[in-house]
C-alpha cells in the first residue's frame, strides 16, 4: 500500500489549550473551546499520510497543526501586533501553500439538520459524491478521522452528548498553491449538483451550505487535531479512522466554472434564498424582538445593523460572540484594536456553528476586519462610530478628532447658501 508524503507545520502554544475540553459540572455537560495561539513555536513535520493517525493521537492539549509553511522550518509564533524580525505572526503573509509542492488538504464534514441538507454517513460516501464531479479522485489516497468533538458520552448513563457524525478527510494536494481555488470551485460544483441548501441562523441570516465546509482553504488556519480533553464522568467512543492508499490529488484537473455555470450557480443560490425567505423573516423578527430589549436599542436600529451584516459590514453596535459565548460589541474592538488583533471568535452571523470560526484582523491601514472561515469563507468589515473612524483616518486622539469634526461641521454650515439648506431639508 502506498501513501504520499507531505510537509505541514506543528504548532505548540506555551499557555493556551489548543483542543476542545469537555466536563461534567453539577450534572451539567460543559464544553470549552480552544484558546488563542499567541505565544509558542512552529516546527515543520514531514510524514506519510497514513502516519498522521498515530501522530495526531500523540499530540498534547497545547498542540495543533497548520497546513501552510513558514519560510524557516523553525519559528517563534506570536500575534500580529507583537510581530518582530524574530517572532512570526500566524498570517497568510507568513504561512503559505508553496507552489508545485505537496500540501495537506482537508474536507470537513459537520452534522447539519437544516431543511434541505444532505446527511453524509461516511467518508466513502462523500468521496463517491465528489467522484461524480472529479473522477480522478477514485485513485487518490486519503485518511479520514472523526472530529475531536465526536462521540463524547456520559459514563453514568451512556448517553451520547455530542454528535458522532462529523469527520475530517485528509488528502495530499499535488500543488498546494491551488488549494484555495480548488475548494472554492468544488463548493460551487457541489451546490450545482444539488447538494446546496440554506441554513437560516437565529438572527435570520440566510447562509449557503453544502456537504463540505468551503472555508477550510487558508494556509494559516489552525487545525485542532489533538485528542479532546475530557473530565471524570465522561468517556469517548472509539471511532476508528479510515485509510485508503493511492496517489496525490491533482487539483488542477478540476476546472473553474464556465460563465454559463457561474450564471446557473447564481440563479440557484437566488432560488434557494427565495425558498427560505419567509422563514428567515420570521427568525429575524423574533430575534430583533428579544435582542433589542437585551441590548437596549430600538428594533429599527437593530434591523439596520443586521441588514448591514448581511452585506458583510458590521456596524459599531453589532454584537460579536466570542468562543466562550460571551459577547462584545464592535465599538469595543474599535476602541482598542491592538488588544483584539488575532483574537479567534465565532462566526458573526452564525455563532451556533461553533468556536474558532473567525478571526479579528487589524490591518496596517487601520482597517479592522473579521475573516470568517465558516462554510465558504466571508470577510466582514467593521465600522466604528463616526468619531472613531475620523480619529483613525487623521491619526489623532478621540478628543482632537471630536474638536476637528465639530469645526468641520461648523464650516460646512457657514458655507451653505439658502438653496443648499432647502435641498438638505
Model-flagged regions — what are they?
Residues 144, 204-207:
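A short glycine-rich, hydrophobically flanked beta-strand micro-motif that places a catalytic Asp/Glu
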Residues 107-117, 127-128, 148-195, 207-425:
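Modules that initiate DNA replication and primer synthesis
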Residues 195-202:
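Conserved short beta-strand edge segments in small beta-sheet-based binding/regulatory domains
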Residues 1-167, 171-193, 277-296:
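Signature for HUH/AEP ssDNA processing cores
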Amino acid at each position: 500500500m502506498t501513501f504520499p508524503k507531505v510537509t505541514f507545520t506543528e504548532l505548540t502554544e506555551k499557555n493556551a489549550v489548543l483542543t476542545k475540553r469537555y466536563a461534567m459540572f453539577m450534572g451539567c455537560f460543559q464544553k470549552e473551546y480552544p484558546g488563542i495561539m499567541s505565544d509558542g513555536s512552529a516546527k515543520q513535520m514531514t510524514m506519510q499520510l497514513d502516519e498522521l493517525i498515530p501522530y495526531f493521537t500523540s499530540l498534547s492539549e497545547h498542540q495543533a497543526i497548520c497546513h501552510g509553511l513558514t519560510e524557516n522550518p523553525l519559528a517563534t509564533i506570536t500575534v500580529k501586533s507583537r510581530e518582530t524580525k524574530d517572532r512570526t505572526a500566524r498570517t497568510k503573509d507568513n504561512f503559505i501553500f508553496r507552489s508545485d509542492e505537496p500540501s495537506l488538504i482537508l474536507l470537513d464534514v459537520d452534522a447539519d439538520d437544516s431543511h434541505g441538507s444532505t446527511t453524509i454517513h461516511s467518508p466513502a460516501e462523500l468521496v463517491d459524491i465528489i467522484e461524480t464531479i472529479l473522477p480522478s479522485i477514485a485513485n487518490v489516497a486519503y485518511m479520514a478521522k472523526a472530529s475531536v468533538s465526536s462521540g463524547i458520552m456520559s459514563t453514568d448513563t451512556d448517553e451520547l452528548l455530542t454528535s458522532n457524525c462529523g469527520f475530517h478527510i485528509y488528502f495530499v494536494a499535488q500543488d498546494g498553491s491551488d488549494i484555495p481555488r480548488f475548494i472554492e470551485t468544488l463548493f460551487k460544483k457541489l451546490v450545482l449538483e444539488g447538494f446546496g441548501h440554506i441554513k437560516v441562523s437565529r438572527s435570520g441570516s440566510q447562509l449557503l451550505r453544502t456537504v463540505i465546509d468551503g472555508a477550510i482553504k487558508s494556509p494559516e488556519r489552525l487545525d485542532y487535531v489533538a485528542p479532546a480533553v475530557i473530565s471524570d464522568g465522561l468517556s469517548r467512543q472509539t471511532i476508528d479512522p479510515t485509510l485508503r492508499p493511492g496517489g496525490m490529488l491533482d487539483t488542477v484537473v478540476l476546472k473553474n466554472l464556465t460563465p454559463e455555470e457561474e450564471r446557473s450557480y447564481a440563479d440557484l443560490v437566488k432560488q434557494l434564498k427565495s425558498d427560505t425567505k419567509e422563514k428567515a423573516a420570521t427568525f429575524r423578527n423574533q430575534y430583533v424582538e428579544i435582542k433589542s430589549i437585551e441590548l437596549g436599542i430600538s428594533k429599527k436600529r437593530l434591523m439596520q445593523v443586521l441588514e448591514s451584516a448581511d452585506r458583510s459590514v458590521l456596524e459599531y453596535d453589532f454584537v460579536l460572540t466570542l468562543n466562550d459565548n460571551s459577547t462584545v460589541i464592535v465599538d469595543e474592538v474599535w476602541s482598542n484594536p491592538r488588544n483584539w488583533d488575532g483574537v479567534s471568535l465565532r462566526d458573526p452571523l452564525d455563532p451556533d456553528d461553533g468556536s474558532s470560526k473567525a478571526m479579528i484582523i487589524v490591518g496596517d491601514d487601520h482597517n479592522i476586519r473579521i475573516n470568517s472561515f465558516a462554510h465558504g469563507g466571508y470577510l466582514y468589515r467593521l465600522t466604528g462610530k463616526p468619531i472613531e473612524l475620523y480619529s483613525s483616518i487623521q491619526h489623532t486622539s478621540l478628543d482632537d478628532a471630536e474638536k476637528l469634526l465639530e469645526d468641520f461641521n461648523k464650516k460646512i454650515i457657514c458655507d451653505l447658501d439658502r438653496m443648499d439648506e432647502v435641498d438638505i431639508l
